[in-house]
Design a protein with these regions (language model features):
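Bacterial N-terminal signal peptides that target proteins for export
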Residues: 2-16
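N-terminal signal peptide c-region/cleavage motif recognized by signal peptidases
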Residues: 18, 24-26
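Signal peptide processing junction and immediate N-terminal pro/mature segment
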Residues: 28-30
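Flexible coil segments in periplasmic/lumen-exposed cytochrome c-class electron-transfer proteins
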Residues: 32-41, 50-53, 82-119
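Sequence context surrounding c-type heme c attachment/ligation sites in exported
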Residues: 34-45, 63-72
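A structural feature that tracks compact, well-ordered secondary-structure segments
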Residues: 58-61, 71-78, 88-92
Length: 119
């Protein structure tokens, strides 16, 4: 019988290994093309801005977001697993290549996070 302590240690080690592999795969091998993504991002600019900074209160900022996260969210909108009125119109027309390119472009945008005074 494996002790609870040993099981916990195995869980922590496997989690850390998985996270490090995910981080390495996301930062080393980008599947998308940043330049192609910028051209495709023209369709995103009304809500998210060409710079990935939201132009409306209902659209999130996506500049500098982690690439695998953007890919996963666009795929979820495309499949219908995630719902949003605007994205439900746009996402179904995106190819896998479009999704990879858009994610590469928006994740490559450098942002500066500034702490608000008094917070």
């Amino acid at each position: 019988m494996i002790s609870v302590r040993l099981k916990a240690r195995q869980l922590v080690l496997s989690s850390l290994t998985s996270l490090s592999l995910l981080a390495a795969s996301g930062s080393v091998c980008s599947a998308g093309d940043v330049k192609a993504g910028r051209a495709k991002a023209l369709m995103c600019q009304a809500c998210h801005g060409l710079d990935g900074l939201s132009k409306t209160p209902d659209a999130p900022n996506i500049a500098g977001q982690i690439e695998p996260y953007l890919v996963a969210q666009l795929q979820a909108f495309k499949s219908g697993a995630r719902k949003n009125d605007a994205m439900s119109v746009v996402a179904p027309s995106l190819s896998d290549r479009d999704i990879e390119d858009l994610a590469a472009y928006f994740s490559a945008i450098e942002i500066n996070v500034v702490k608000m005074p008094g917070r």
